[in-house]
Every structure is written in structure tokens, then in C-alpha cells.
Amino acid sequence: MRALLGLLLVFGGCTFALYLLSTRLPLGPRLAAAGEPEGRSLWFPSDLAELRELSEVLREYRKEHQAYVFLLFCSAYLYKQGFAIPGSSFLNVLAGALFGPWLGLLLCCVLTSVGATGCYLLSSLFGKQLVISYFPDKVALLQKKVEENRNSLFFFLLFLRLFPMTPNWFLNLSAPILNIPIVQFFFSVLIGLIPYNFICVQTGSILSTLTSLDALFSWETVLKLLAIALVALVPGTLIKKFSQKRLALSETSDIGHPDRRKDA
């Protein structure tokens, strides 16, 4: 009970801080043009239409308040990652639209790693018993696979990040239970999610620059789409290479779907 109360206290404090950041905005050019008061708040996008609207608002607002937009974006990203809240893919796309393809990619990789490590620490301090209570079978299966691959643990962690059937939120929550060293955990997230982050950020960069259908077929856009396609092939190639040479992976795909496992 004390652990749950501690977690709720931390969550409430972070939620309140993010609320203040998103509702106490300095008046920007777009807000001033619309004649809106300073109490305007921002929101987490839930679909592409909201994402595009938010991107337009923040890009205009960033002209006069670049540091504030950067702080707000980083805070929102770490909030979602730290508390394992779905929807970080929208923020990756937003990063590409706001900061461009390369700065956006660097920012997302760092924030993903820091946020996931924050989730690791929160789980270690407050959530171990909750995770074990709610997901006993998943924890047991993942524990078994971690022990089987303990001698090549870092490559196994990379595999779990690259493998699309493995839920990242569960890996973040269960890692301290499995005695995964925090340094290996951090760098496996930093490296393993580069392809995923690249695809999302490049998508945001493309969407932010399109003004017509003709722009979709420009050489710059075509090259970006080609780069996305090539990067999308990386996880499968790495999985095939490392799974054949170094890892014991017979049941890993069932971690997120225990009902798919066959009876022994």
C-alpha cells in the first residue's frame, strides 16, 4: 500500500507540473492573433488530425518561445515514457515536424532512453509487487528468457527492442524485477529503438513540409521515403542474424501474448 501511495504521489506531482506548463503559456503570435487569453492549454494528440493541428500551433508559437516549446515537449515526452502511457509515437512524429529530421531523431532517442530509465526506476521503487501481481505469467516467461540469454544479455535486450511483438512498456516495468543492469537497459533502449524513432520522426518531417500532392513526389520526399523503407528492414535483419548465432528465443514472441503459447 505504501508503494502504491508513493507512486500516486509522484504521478500526481508530475501531472500537476505538466498541467502548469501547458496552461500557463506566455502569449505567442498565433494566440495573440486569435485574441485568446494567456490561459490557453495544449493537449496530447490522439489522431493525425489533432497532431497536425498541434504541430501548426507549436511551430508558430516556437518563433517567439523556442525554449519554452522545447521544455514543454521534453516534459510531455518524459511524462509519457516515465509512466508507461501509450502515445509516444505521436510525439515522435511531432518531433520531426517541430525540430526537423536529425535534431528530432537525436532528441527522441535521448528522451526515449531517459524516460524508459525513469520508468525502470519508478518500477524499482514502487511497482515491483504490482507488476508481479498483475502480470505473473509474463514476468515468469520473460525471466526464463533473460536467464537463458544472461551471457549475451545486451544483445537479447536489443532483440526485445527491435522485435515489434514485444511491448516496450512491459519491458520498462519488468526490467528491475529481472535484475537487468540499468546501464545495459539504458543503452539497449538508446540503440534498439533508433529504427522505430527514425521512421516516426522522418514521417513527421515529411508531413510538416508537404503543401500539395506535387510535393509528395519531389526528389527530397522520395529519398526520405526510401530511407524510411530501408531502415524498416533493419530490425528483421538484425533479429535473424543474432537469433541464429547468439540467442535462445524460442518463446520470446509470446511475452506480449501469453495465450498464444502452446501447451507443453
Swiss-Prot record:
Key words of the record: Membrane, Signal, Transmembrane, Transmembrane helix
Bilayer disposition of the protein: Multi-pass membrane protein
Transmembrane segments annotated in the record for this chain: 67-87, 100-122, 153-173, 175-195, 219-239
Compartments reported by the entry: Membrane
UniProt cross-references to Pfam families, sorted A to Z: VTT_dom
Family annotation (InterPro entries): TM41A/B, VTT_dom
Signal peptide: 1-17
Segments of this protein annotated with the region VTT domain: 96-207
Highest taxon above the source species: Eukaryota
GO CC annotation terms, alphabetical: membrane
Family recorded in the similarity comment: Belongs to the TMEM41 family.
Record remark: domains: The VTT domain was previously called the SNARE-assoc domain. As there is no evidence that this domain associates with SNARE proteins, it was renamed as VMP1, TMEM41, and TVP38 (VTT) domain.
Protein name from the UniProt record: Transmembrane protein 41A
Gene name linked to the record: Tmem41a
